[in-house]
């Protein structure tokens, strides 16, 4: 399915956030917000690949850049983007999925758990965490799991089985304790950057994109019933 790229400047305090939307050339119902990790920007190859894949299957996709290591700042920026989409007269979406890579997924999780209590119209439908940074390398005793336990809507984790910032058995234990319906897709032998020895980057991207699209479609199809 064809789509159109639209560049945006989203108000954030006295600043503007750079964003790019991929808008399918048909009636759209659902959108996905994506943002990058501690480094890079919205033009991270994997985010671009994922956005293109989702848009080609009929989903509105917005990527935005918010640089910096201050998680509070990142969370506020994410809230501004979510509010922009929710109040936009141009893109009248029935719902959105919040997503991000690494630090971006941590910001998305925080926004989701604070948004849900006031989300009377169920605008936020789910959370997509790519390489969620559950802990610092070699600091497995300090887990970033508090926000995850407060979320009630569906959550998809896509993580590498060799991720130095997300030990496999620890994420599985967290998922079991979450009140939200959760699913974990492990990319075998992938590290935090989703690099896998012996596999091409595009091959890994394809696996990730396929899993995320399938999960989103499962939820949106249930909404139609």
UniProtKB/Swiss-Prot annotation:
Instruction: Tell me which Gene3D superfamilies the record gives.
Output: alpha/beta hydrolase (3.40.50.1820)
Which pairs of positions does the record mark as disulfide bonds? Answer: none
Q: Which PANTHER family match?
A: TESTIS DEVELOPMENT PROTEIN PRTD (PTHR13136), TESTIS-EXPRESSED PROTEIN 30 (PTHR13136:SF11)
Tell me what this protein is called.
Testis-expressed protein 30
Species of origin reads Mus musculus
The organism's taxonomy opens as: Eukaryota, Metazoa, Chordata, Craniata, Vertebrata
Gene assigned in the entry: Tex30
């Amino acid at each position: 399915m064809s789509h159109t790229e639209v560049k945006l400047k989203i108000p954030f305090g006295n600043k503007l956030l750079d964003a790019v939307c991929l808008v399918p050339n048909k009636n759209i119902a659902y959108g996905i917000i994506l943002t990058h990790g501690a480094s890079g920007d919205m033009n991270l190859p994997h985010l671009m690949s994922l956005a293109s894949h989702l848009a080609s299957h009929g989903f509105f996709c917005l990527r935005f850049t918010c640089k910096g290591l201050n998680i509070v700042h990142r969370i506020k920026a994410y809230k501004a983007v979510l509010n922009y989409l929710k109040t936009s007269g141009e893109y009248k979406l029935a719902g959105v999925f919040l997503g991000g890579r690494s630090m971006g997924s941590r910001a998305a999780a925080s926004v989701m758990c604070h948004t849900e209590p006031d989300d009377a119209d169920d605008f936020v439908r789910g959370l997509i965490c790519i390489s969620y940074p559950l802990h610092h390398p070699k600091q497995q005793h300090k887990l970033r799991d508090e926000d995850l336990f407060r979320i009630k809507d569906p959550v998809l984790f896509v993580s590498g089985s060799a991720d130095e910032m997300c030990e496999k058995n620890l994420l599985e234990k967290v998922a079991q304790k979450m009140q939200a319906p959760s699913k974990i897709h492990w990319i075998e032998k992938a590290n935090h950057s989703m690099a896998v020895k012996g596999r091409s980057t595009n091959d890994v991207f394809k696996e990730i994109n396929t899993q995320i699209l399938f999960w989103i479609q499962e939820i949106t199809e249930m909404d139609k019933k």
